[in-house]
């Protein structure tokens, strides 16, 4: 049985062109070593269109029965099957050479190849990504993308407990450091033996390009600094974003904000995220045009979007960078008590920006989303953060991906919403169920809104209402609301920018 699985896996690698015919014996013997086997009887049966997921399952089941890992959980299985797949992954220098060769023909050919390679090697577990639930919800801001993430493994209590007993390690320093490439992993750090990273320069500084293993959207890429330095929204950041889309015009690239609450989950390592995807925010129209003094050549406007987005566009990226520098400089120190915007309290800074760059034909576009992380007694996790009544759907930060209109909702909602649908159809009070009690008030609102909820329409209704809750999360994160007072506040800020003198460099 295991001989068949080994042959299938080697055949898969040949089919995907990860290895060549001359590599078969070497790779087979490498697998035997990992599996603790001394011999191999090659099956006569030939295989075609090998299913990677089921073949790896066979190998993992065999390995667990042979006590090659202690617990039959996702954490241990992922560590082991990454070691197995590393047998077929080429050396970094060869991968880089192939990428650069294709890049000279076309940036898109290079990324197409690299994305497929990252899936074929099982670094991106495509069969898991397919399990994510996805739909679109119509809102006043256009269709929002809603996803419930099922591909990222849940934290394993046994692995967490075992990790606490292990000797603590600070290598790699974080999951974005270049030193992850080829790392075998441990219980509290994923295996990265199958990852390959592409080096390149942004403004004369060394960065690397890789894909996210969880692919929240098409060709979800991560661009990260070669050094372990903190995130920072500044001149260099704007230069890097626009420099990247100049190199890869079919991609977008953005940065999480550099402050807690409004930033992402990793603030300690300078990095950006992007990919080959048109986000809902990019489809949103300019609601009102803005004229910035000394920048009449730059098209600018407020975007019709729940967060406060200033869209800048020009053929000249240097002009965008200069204006973005000015807007950021003013925003960092800007206080408007009338709009409850404070640059700092007790020495703690609050104002920052979530920037995103993309290209539309020959125009460079820079989206500058104004953020503020102030907390209050009423909103201890942030005034411009999803408010408490929405936490039953999303309590986490509104980071870069959500800012652009794609909800990455927690996996717990898969079971909770399925149960809630059943309760809505059968008129059961969710408050009586520990799994769904957090949704009880929301369920009442849904019942009041829809007079006829039945088994044929309940899923569509719950999905729509989930999307509308996400839209409200984005509205909460907006520093200027979509009303007259919000527009007046936005205008006051722009007036302040226009009064700011230019810095001569």
Describe each model-derived feature in a short phrase.
Residues 171, 266-270, 278, 294-297, ...:
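Short alpha-helical interface elements
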């Amino acid at each position: 049985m295991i001989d068949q699985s080994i042959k299938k896996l080697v055949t898969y690698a040949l089919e995907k062109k990860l290895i060549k015919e001359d590599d078969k014996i070497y790779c087979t013997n490498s697998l035997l070593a990992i599996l603790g086997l001394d011999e191999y009887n090659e099956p006569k049966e030939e295989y075609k269109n090998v299913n990677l997921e089921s073949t790896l399952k066979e190998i993992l089941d065999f390995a667990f029965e042979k006590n090659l890992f202690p617990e039959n959980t996702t954490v241990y299985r992922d560590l082991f099957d990454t070691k197995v797949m590393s047998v077929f992954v080429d050396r970094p220098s060869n991968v880089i050479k192939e990428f650069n060769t294709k890049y000279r023909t076309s940036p898109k050919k290079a990324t197409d190849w690299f994305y497929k390679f990252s899936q074929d090697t099982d670094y991106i577990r495509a069969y898991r990504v397919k399990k994510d639930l996805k739909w679109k919800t119509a809102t006043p801001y256009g269709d929002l993308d809603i996803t419930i993430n099922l591909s990222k493994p849940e934290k394993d209590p046994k692995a967490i407990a075992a990790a606490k007993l292990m000797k603590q390690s600070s290598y790699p320093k974080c999951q974005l450091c270049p030193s992850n490439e080829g790392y075998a992993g441990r219980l509290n750090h994923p295996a990265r033996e199958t990852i390959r990273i592409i080096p390149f320069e942004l403004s004369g500084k060394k960065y690397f390009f890789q894909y996210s293993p969880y692919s929240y959207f098409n060709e979800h890429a991560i661009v990260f600094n070669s050094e372990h330095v903190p995130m920072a929204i500044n001149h260099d950041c704007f230069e890097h974003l626009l420099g990247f889309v100049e190199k890869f015009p079919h991609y977008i690239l953005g940065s999480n904000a550099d402050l807690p609450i409004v930033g992402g989950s990793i603030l300690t390592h300078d990095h950006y995220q992007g990919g080959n995807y048109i986000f809902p925010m990019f489809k949103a129209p300019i609601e009102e045009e803005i004229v910035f003094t000394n920048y009449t050549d730059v098209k600018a406007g407020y975007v019709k979007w729940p967060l406060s987005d200033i869209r800048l566009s020009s053929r000249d990226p240097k002009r965008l960078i200069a204006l973005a520098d000015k807007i950021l400089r003013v925003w960092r120190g800007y206080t408007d008590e009338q709009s409850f915007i404070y640059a700092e309290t007790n020495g703690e800074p609050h104002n920052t920006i979530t920037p995103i760059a993309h290209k539309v034909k020959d125009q460079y576009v820079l989206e500058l989303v104004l953020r503020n992380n102030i907390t209050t007694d009423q909103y201890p996790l942030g005034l411009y953060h999803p408010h408490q009544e929405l936490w039953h759907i999303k309590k986490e930060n509104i980071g870069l991906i959500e800012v652009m209109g794609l909800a990455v909702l927690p996996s717990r909602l898969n079971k909770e919403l399925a149960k809630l649908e059943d309760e809505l159809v059968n008129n059961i009070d969710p408050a009586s169920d520990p799994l769904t009690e957090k949704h009880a008030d929301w369920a009442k609102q849904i019942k009041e809104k829809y007079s006829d909820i039945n088994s044929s329409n309940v899923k569509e209704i719950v999905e729509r209402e989930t999307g509308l809750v996400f839209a409200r999360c984005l509205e909460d994160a907006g520093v200027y609301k979509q009303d007259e007072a919000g527009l007046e506040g936005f205008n006051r800020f722009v007036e302040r920018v226009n009064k700011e003198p230019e810095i001569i460099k």
